[in-house]
Amino acid sequence: KNNIYNIYMLNNDTRKLIDYFIHDYKYNAELKNNNNNLFQQIYHQLNALDNVNFKSNLSVNSFKTFELLSSSFIPKHIKIEINKTKKIYTYKCNINNSNTTIYIKFYVSEYSKITITKQKQMLKKILLVIKFLFLYKSNNTINNLTIHIHMSKHKKFLPKNNTDILNQNNVNTAVTYACAKEGECIIYRKEEWFKVLIHELMHSLCLDFSSFNYTLLKKKNTQ
């Protein structure tokens, strides 16, 4: 189990959730064998990519707002934190010899303390998963992909009242534009940031259901 955690670089919060949900989990032998084959394939692909050196150019700039920051999915108190950013460290690189340029921006302030050493550690993880997902992406028209990272310490929490409607303080950690030519996403919590980034990248690279033909799918379901 620890080896699996190390491979996917999961933090303690995610590990606890996995332990909770997979405890006593049962599935048939055929499904287990199929899953094992898939996991082995993914492991070997990640292992091969992990040995690749990524080249990037670093620039440091002052804070400049961006459209995605106005999203209602970002809590107001975290927006205030982001707007107090002192420096933005931007790493520019290309993946798999593609025409897509990747911009990874770390927002550094008293609310988001990310040292250069930490940035480089995170950068390697991010580029590894992007390079892996690029092997499967269906969106060939994406020109640029910009990832904004603000490591707020504010965690998600459940409302005190069971009848309250869940909002951005309870369930959201990121926002993204799905299948856009100018791809963009923002990760604004330190909590489970890497797991959430993988999820958002699947939206950005059209690896989700957004490109499905729902009319055809509905027709097949009614047959």
Report the location of each language-model feature.
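Compositionally biased low-complexity segments enriched in polar/charged residues
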Residues: 1-5, 12-13, 98, 223
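Long, contiguous juxta-domain segments that are non-catalytic but functionally important
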Residues: 6-95
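Auxiliary, metal-adjacent structural segments of Zn-dependent hydrolase domains
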Residues: 66-181, 190
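Eukaryotic basic, amphipathic alpha-helical target segments in cytosolic regions
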Residues: 134-137, 205, 209
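Extended, charge-rich low-complexity interaction segments
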Residues: 185, 189-196, 218
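Active-site recognition of the HExxH zinc-binding catalytic motif
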Residues: 195-208
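Post-HExxH zinc-binding segment in Zn-dependent metallohydrolases
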Residues: 209-223
